[in-house]
Amino acid sequence: MVLSPTDKTNVKTAWGHVGAQAGEYGAEALERMFLSFPTTKTYFPHFDLSHGSAQVKAHGKKVGDALTQAVGHLDDLPGALSALSDLHAYKLRVDPVNFKLLSHCLLVTLALHHPQDFTPAVHASLDKFLSNVSTVLTSKYR
């Protein structure tokens, strides 16, 4: 899906509200994903997956940092996320459906923390953005 100029503005504005909490929200979304979709835990057998775990927080920061990088490169997501795509495709071998599950949990997390900013238009733009990120991260699986 191509992000329109309005989508790009919505994504940048919404992510601007996230700011320094990107890692925190990433960890919350991961925790929500593990609770809602227990099969996703199989990729983290070495993690302490309990609430507030330092390992989940650290991985949440990686997720938040990657999304912040992606927001900064909306016109070149494949270039910005190439190394991460390689990692997930060739080393970690994460089932592509898990990116959709995490995207959903990220949307829920953002809606909970920023209900006043989470309009239907912003929701749609963020959904398109996260879908594009998921597509890039799974592009090297083929």
From Swiss-Prot:
Binding-site residues, heme b: 88
* Record-level GO BP terms: hydrogen peroxide catabolic process
Q: Which residues cross the membrane?
A: none
Q: Which SUPFAM superfamilies match?
A: Globin-like
Q: What's an example of a GO molecular-function annotation for this chain? A: iron ion binding
Quick one: which residues bind O2?
A: 59
Residues modified as Phosphothreonine are 9, 109, 135, 138
- Matches recorded under PROSITE patterns: GLOBIN
> Which sequence positions carry the modification called Phosphotyrosine?
25
Arranged from A to Z, the UniProt key words for this protein are:
Heme, Iron, Metal-binding, Oxygen transport, Phosphoprotein, Transport
Keyword Iron (UniProt): yes
* Residue(s) carrying Phosphoserine: 4, 36, 50, 103, 125, 139
Superkingdom of source: Eukaryota
GO cellular component annotations of the record: blood microparticle; haptoglobin-hemoglobin complex; hemoglobin complex
- Where N6-succinyllysine occurs along the chain? 8, 12, 41
Q: Which residues form the Globin domain?
A: 2-142
A Pfam family this chain is assigned to: Globin
What's its job? Involved in oxygen transport from the lung to the various peripheral tissues.
Q: Which PANTHER family match?
A: HEMOGLOBIN FAMILY MEMBER, HEMOGLOBIN SUBUNIT ALPHA
By sequence similarity, the record places it as follows:
Belongs to the globin family.
This protein's name? Hemoglobin subunit alpha
Give the organism, scientific name.
Ceratotherium simum (White rhinoceros)
